[in-house]
Amino acid sequence: MFHLTTALDAASGVPLYEQLYESLAAEMRSGAIPAGTRMPGKRRLAAELSVSVNTVDAAYQILATEGYMEPRERSGFYVQEYLALPTRPEEVPPPVSAAPPEAAEPPVRFDLSTRGVDPRLFPFRTWARLQKELLYSSPQLLTHGDAQGDVELRQALADYLEEYRGVRCTAEQVVVGAGMEYLLSLLAPLLPGKTAVENPGYQRAKQVLENNGVACCCLPVDADGLSVEALSGSGAAVCYVTPSHQFPTGVTMPAGRRTELLHWASRCPGQRYIIEDDYDSEFRFDTPPLPSLQGMAGADGPVVYLSTCSRSLAPGIRIAYMVLPRQLLPAWRAKYRIYSGTVSRFEQQTLARFIREGYFTRHLARERVAYKARRDALTASLRAAFAPDELTLTGLHTGLHLLARLKNAPPDAALHAAAKAQGVALSLLSDYDLTGGEQEFPGTFVLGYGSLSEASFPEAGETLRKVCTAAREASVTV
């Protein structure tokens, strides 16, 4: 007699053949019906379970289709051999090392981090309207797009960059991707050799390049940006720079230094390149921006231009773009033509219209007004809290952060600990030392004001003073 451990329920909303299939499959998986077992004939099992032959037949067919049983001619159905499972499952080994429980972090009262932007400035209504129109009118955007990005967005970006950043390129030179890190990782295999990066500088860019097999060397930054003298003696074939707003020092590379840098690259055509990360170029408050390095070099020059919408729109949009020199296009296409695009086509087309119809430039103008007011409020708060010779402010003219150098500063570790205790999220210039060596940039705060609310600015300076006082007291007692 054949017995099921689970009874069939005719009153259930689940069809009987599905109940029978589930019960038999479970018993086969558990080993209750061993592998190799000859299953009862359909009529016999139907009689024993008081169900129709069609019910048993339907359950058997599903079990056979899914590999639980195999039919043998003139013999019946047999449970597949490979379905036999151990009756006692192996114990799961413990983790190699249990992570200690994290201590509760003090709540952040003042967010002075450099990556913050204000989501309230995002153009929600316009963006939503454009996306809705595209969603209903352009179903073709659900299909695959160009690996370099939709041509409409690439053309809109090329036109915008030419007008506002002096970049000289065609749409075919523009590559759209989901973030600067993604684009850098694709660019890395095309680079001819060692890459020089700024120090202090952007750790993320260095890490991405190294993750993709590019050797990096760290070169000093002076009052005019990356030292070309140090670059010339470094043996590097590529340099990664942020000339519009050096991160994190805030230095803007002047025209003379830009010319020197281009001369360095032009001495070895096709063997030297400059990666220009046009970081924060949209936010220049007091003076007109200098033209991009790419614009100075031209479409056939040795400059790869990088930018992103993470600051101008929002980090969650995940749209970055790169302008390749024409001589790198064949290598790019040979390597990446099989790739798929990484940015939603609806997002791409929304941004294309946002730029083409003039919304982007108006949005940037509103952002500049808002962020300039925040910069002014933060500097006023700092100057009210500190004596004139106690705190030196630099890097005020561009971007969404500034530097504050503290006179007779306590150790940076003490400043970090005191800031954390006061609920202040901030960075110090030494955090961006890429050499990992001894501290070279002591006592300098890197203060972002992109995400700080207007109501917080009056207290920001006094809170930072409390941080400095607590750090000094802690240093004395150690």
What is each PLM-predicted segment?
Residues 1-132, 139-142, 327-328, 333, ...:
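N-terminal basic, amphipathic alpha-helical segments
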Residues 74, 296-331:
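Active-site PLP attachment segment
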Residues 112, 274-275:
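Residue-level marker for buried hydrophobic side chains located in beta-strands
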Residues 117, 244-246, 311:
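Short glycine-rich anion-binding loops that position phosphate/pyrophosphate groups of nucleotides
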Residues 131-134, 140-271, 282, 286-299, ...:
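Conserved core of the PLP fold type I
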